[in-house]
């Protein structure tokens, strides 16, 4: 009997995974918080900024850890799993970010070492050195090193602007000229009219593809609960989710809906290792 799930996975392998093979390492979704908000995350100033804009790590006061997983289009074969650790010091914040995408027959790995520092009040820069690996058992493995840079700044009283570039120097992942690590630029702004509301918009440009627009809204209903929604274009995708705040522990649950491929559920657990 034909297994339709396996057929769908095969289709996704050719039309989704293989294009990603030529885009190894591009920034992962900024946790379930980012997934819910259309990944309009270049202005985040929490542990999730380890995935979207390292400059945001400069504003952390406590050592923090997060783990995030998403199952793209409900297929285990194209799941993505990430973890990050940030350690603030008087000299700046040091970070480690890890990501695994795929399954045993095709997978990509990313290891990033980050540093962020607040230069002036509300103005910070960040940088990360990445090792990117791709493994296909039948063809072997390949790995390259690249880097990413970010900046954030307060604009007026209630605005944050952010910019981040991944792999500014285009590097070939393999000897095949097609397998190039892409350059991706994200620029965004967040408006915080109150302490409970965040409105974020962002423009993302992969230098090989059409630019995409992303936007998200976060509303802290009560101290223990936040509500989130978001949208994105190219491809059209809608997101929604919640954040549960339990002292030092945050639990984020989200889902995104792709116009053709369906749902992507995701969840994050974040923990402040010091403080309250």
Spans of model-derived segments:
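Domain-scale selection of a single, long terminal region
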Residues: 2-4, 19, 85-87
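Bacterial N-terminal signal peptides that target proteins for export
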Residues: 1-11
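Bacterial N-terminal signal peptides
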Residues: 9-19
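Subset of outer-membrane beta-barrel
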Residues: 23-276
């Amino acid at each position: 009997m034909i297994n339709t799930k396996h057929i769908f996975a095969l289709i996704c392998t050719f039309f989704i995974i293989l294009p990603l093979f030529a885009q190894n390492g591009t920034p992962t979704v900024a946790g379930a918080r980012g997934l819910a908000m259309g990944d309009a995350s270049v202005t985040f100033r929490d542990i999730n900024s380890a995935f979207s804009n390292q400059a945001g790590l400069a504003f952390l006061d406590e050592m923090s850890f997060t783990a995030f997983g998403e199952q793209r289009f409900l297929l285990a074969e194209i799941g993505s799993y990430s973890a990050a650790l940030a350690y603030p010091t008087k000299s700046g914040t040091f970070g480690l970010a890890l990501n695994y995408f795929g399954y045993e027959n095709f997978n990509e790995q990313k290891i990033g070492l980050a540093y962020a520092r607040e230069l002036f009040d509300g103005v910070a820069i960040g940088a990360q050195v990445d090792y990117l690996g791709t493994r296909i058992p039948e063809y072997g493995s390949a790995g390259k090193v690249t880097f990413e840079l970010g900046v954030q700044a307060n604009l007026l009283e209630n605005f944050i602007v952010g910019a981040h570039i991944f792999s500014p120097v285009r590097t070939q992942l393999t000897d095949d000229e097609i397998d190039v690590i892409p350059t991706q630029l994200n620029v965004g702004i967040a408006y915080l009219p109150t302490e409970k509301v965040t409105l974020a918009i962002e423009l993302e440009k992969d230098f090989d593809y059409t630019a995409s627009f992303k936007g998200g809204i976060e509303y802290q209903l009560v101290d223990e609960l936040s509500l989130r929604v978001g949208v994105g274009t190219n491809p059209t995708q809608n997101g929604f989710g919640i954040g549960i705040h339990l002292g030092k522990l945050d639990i984020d649950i989200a889902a995104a809906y792709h116009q053709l491929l369906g749902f992507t559920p995701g969840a994050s657990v974040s923990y402040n290792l010091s403080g309250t």
